[in-house]
């Protein structure tokens, strides 16, 4: 069960639809100086671009603690990219330095993907994904086949093959858990996208807004998310009927032929069950418009080109509703 929930037609080629969707090493807090923009022709809701007008917010300060953890950290230290907090070290094997960070590290994998590997919507859930697949995706970033000039492109170009291997093997060894709850609604809570962490948050004014043709993903525990607590999951609001429509598209496409029973992965083919809907949608849009390439993406391009925006929302919603293992 997700922890802390808000306290209070398509051809059989859809079987390869998400073969190139597996989580990639996408860092969410990497380059604060890079201007984030939505690629032309793509829906802005999928890219978590911070609102220009920001409501006042209270940021964590001083010593912070995560519920259920015996550890504590200085908020300012763990807010950067070099020293991700390890709130629950007994829940995973010892991480390599490229993941854990520390002295001499500029960007630690765990700062955006968390020590659990499950990340936030602006990053990716890579827990339990095949090491060979993750290594291949890093090679795509390094060659430019996958484009992310603000984040993963620069990281891939400066990360050694050995560090990539160690990080991939670490994340592949982890067991994913349910990290997102998908809720269908026509009127989700009113939200805004915060500059800090690029997370969509509940608007302090309250109220609701029409869902329209969007996926709105918010932290179930905003403070826990900001201090990178791996137990602080997310809620994804999606249009009514999305899950059933997505299930129909996935089943008619026979996607389990590639992704295995329950869409939990098979061999080097990645798990797509339980991935965050916003992340999946973003990858589908990226494939359609050319910023996601490489051998794995090539057979998907003609398939993704036929999908409507509502199809992408539905497929992403259904995958997010599935148990990850």
Q: Where are the language model's segments positioned?
A:
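Short cysteine/histidine-rich zinc-coordinating motifs and their immediately flanking basic loops
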Residues: 120-126, 266-273
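Bacterial N-terminal signal peptides
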Residues: 13-27
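N-terminal secretory signal peptides that target proteins for export/translocation
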Residues: 1-12
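Long compositionally biased, domain-poor regions of proteins
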Residues: 5, 115, 135-136, 244-251, ...
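Flexible coil segments in periplasmic/lumen-exposed cytochrome c-class electron-transfer proteins
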Residues: 34-107, 147-157, 161-253, 289-325
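Bacterial Sec-dependent signal peptides at the C-terminal "C-region" and cleavage site
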Residues: 26-34
